[in-house]
Curated annotation (Swiss-Prot):
It comes from Thermoplasma volcanium (strain ATCC 51530 / DSM 4299 / JCM 9571 / NBRC 15438 / GSS1). Coiled coil: none annotated. SUPFAM superfamilies: YbjQ-like. Pfam families: YbjQ_1. This is UPF0145 protein TV0671. Gene3D superfamilies: Hypothetical protein apc22750. Chain B. Disulfide bonds: none annotated. Belongs to the UPF0145 family. InterPro entries: UPF0145_dom_sf (IPR035439), UPF0145_YbjQ-like (IPR002765).
Length: 122
């Protein structure tokens, strides 16, 4: 859970110990990034040697984090305290830009009452 925003974000369709009291709907956080000419040249030179291209890995990691922050903001704006079924999608725009979308279902959850007795089978 993100303590700063108090938004629970999970890839599952449920949250252990919580019950969904309201489904708000699909929300998303979108960002588009470009590496820039200098970064593309450095990454291109590194690709000649093979292996990981750390410049692109860092850019994509930062871009995913930005998309997640925007998804959290969207959840707060619609009154959700959780996002279930969190997913990512990406696509290229032209040859120099990458779009990252974080999306999921905004919901309101509350703790499962501890006063419910569980009935076991004998």
């Amino acid at each position: 859970m993100d303590e700063e925003h108090n938004i629970i974000m999970v890839t599952t369709n449920y949250i252990p110990g919580k019950k969904i009291t309201r489904i708000i709907g699909t929300i998303w956080g979108i960002t588009v990034r470009s590496r820039g000419l200098g970064g593309n040249i450095v990454a291109g030179l590194r690709s000649l040697a093979g292996g990981e291209i750390k410049e692109y890995s860092k850019m994509l990691s930062d871009t995913r984090n930005t998309a997640m922050e925007r998804l959290r903001d969207a959840a707060e704006q619609v009154g959700a305290n959780a996002v279930i079924e969190l997913r990512f999608d990406s696509s290229d725009i032209g040859q120099v830009m990458t779009e990252i979308v974080a999306y999921g279902t905004a919901v309101v959850v509350e703790d499962v009452s501890s006063d419910i007795q569980r009935v076991g089978l004998s």
